[in-house]
Amino acid sequence: MKKNYYIGACIALILSGPTFAQGEMHNTNEQIAEQSSVDLIAEIYHSDRYAETFVESEQFEQEESTSKEPILFVTPYDQLKDKLESWADLHGYVVKWNTQKTVQFDNAVAYEGDFEQVLTELASDINQIGIDINFKIFQKNKVIVVYSVR
């Protein structure tokens, strides 16, 4: 039988001082943390009214295990340089921008796969529209060099 879980319940429980949970009064955050039943996901009532905040536990676990990392999302008006620098930083990389060219995205796109696949796909898309931008990845020192040949 599938159970529904409310994801924000525990966070609210931990952050709000004295709290009622399942009929008990908790006076300190330490007592809340000691409870074995209080994890990051706390079970509460089953209601269609809360459908937006409920997640079926099996579906939640499956989505976590099948998601590909890393994912790069770009939206219209994003600048490639800014987006690439922030995304690379999340994964411990530094971007060296060695070109005068700028790229602004017109559409929303999500790139998925391993780190190199994302950069290869991104470079391919940029080159297909006639912009000469390439990426060189140095994994040992975690640097991505962006350059133009022409």
Curated annotation (Swiss-Prot):
Changing T66P: In strain: Z17561. InterPro entries: Pilus_synth_Q_C. Pfam families: TcpQ. Involved in TCP pilus biogenesis. This is Toxin coregulated pilus biosynthesis protein Q. It comes from Vibrio cholerae serotype O1 (strain ATCC 39315 / El Tor Inaba N16961). The gene is tcpQ.
